[in-house]
């Protein structure tokens, strides 16, 4: 191993160690240590907030596709004309599970955003008091106020779309269970009215997600 390889391997090991400490700190609930470790890697709270918002936006993009797929599957089943009903039920069940997992992932991203934004704003408020320049202090206060306003709009949109998933998931689960216990043409026919109703809910959810994604883009651009 040459010197460059030796230095590279040790740098990689050091980064792995620091990241491991960050993960342990997060699991133990010690946020200050968690953020401190990330700062050692060159990622400050502002950078983490940007990353978390981007992650949430990507998760919502995926959720849009998965909820649309679930709706498409239900529509196909209501027009089911013979074939293997057991396979149809399994497909609906998997759609529900995918949507449920995605919703849980989005809720987790929102929690990350809430935690790091609270820490960032607290730190920002504290640092504002250390300015000796009235002009710079006033400018920083104004920037903080604008950032908070954009954050509030983003958080409201994120929470609204996340909350809208809950009743839709409950209805998807109901339909999967109904099919499980009633694998016959009569049961399929009984779902038609439900599918028409849930279609409107999913379209509304997708519109809310689009709004949330737009708010995320606006917020990220404002952090540049």
PLM feature spans:
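C-terminal motif of bacterial Sec signal peptides marking the signal peptidase cleavage site
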Residues: 25-29
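Long amphipathic all-alpha helical oligomerization modules
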Residues: 34, 159, 166-224
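Short amphipathic alpha-helical segments with heptad-repeat character
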Residues: 50-57, 61-64, 93, 97-100, ...
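Extended amphipathic alpha-helical interaction segments
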Residues: 109-189
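Primarily heptad-repeat coiled-coil rod domains in cytosolic scaffolding/tethering proteins
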Residues: 37, 44, 51, 80, ...
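Bacterial N-terminal signal peptides that target proteins for export
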Residues: 2-19
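Immediate post-signal-peptide N-terminus of mature secreted/exported proteins
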Residues: 31-99
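Long amphipathic alpha-helical segments with strong coiled-coil/leucine-zipper propensity
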Residues: 64, 75-142
């Amino acid at each position: 191993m040459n010197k460059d390889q030796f230095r590279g391997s040790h740098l990689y090991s050091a980064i792995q160690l620091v990241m491991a400490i960050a993960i342990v700190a997060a699991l133990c609930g010690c946020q200050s240590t968690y953020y401190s470790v990330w700062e050692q890697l060159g990622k400050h709270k502002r950078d983490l907030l940007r990353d978390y918002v981007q992650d949430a936006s990507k998760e919502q993009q995926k959720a849009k596709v998965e909820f649309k797929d679930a709706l498409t599957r239900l529509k196909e089943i209501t027009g089911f004309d013979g074939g293997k009903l057991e396979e149809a039920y399994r497909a609906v069940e998997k759609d529900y599970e995918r949507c449920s997992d995605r919703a849980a992932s989005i809720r987790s991203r929102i929690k990350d955003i809430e935690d790091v934004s609270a820490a960032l704003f607290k730190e920002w408020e504290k640092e504002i008091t250390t300015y000796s320049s009235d002009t710079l202090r006033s400018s920083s206060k104004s920037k903080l106020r604008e950032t908070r306003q954009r954050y509030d709009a983003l958080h409201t949109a994120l929470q609204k779309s996340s909350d809208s998933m809950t009743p839709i998931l409950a209805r998807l689960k109901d339909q999967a269970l109904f099919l499980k216990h009633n694998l016959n043409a009569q049961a399929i026919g009984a779902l038609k009215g439900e599918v028409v109703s849930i279609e409107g809910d999913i379209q509304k959810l997708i519109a809310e997600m689009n709004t949330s994604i737009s708010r995320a883009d606006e917020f990220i651009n404002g952090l540049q």
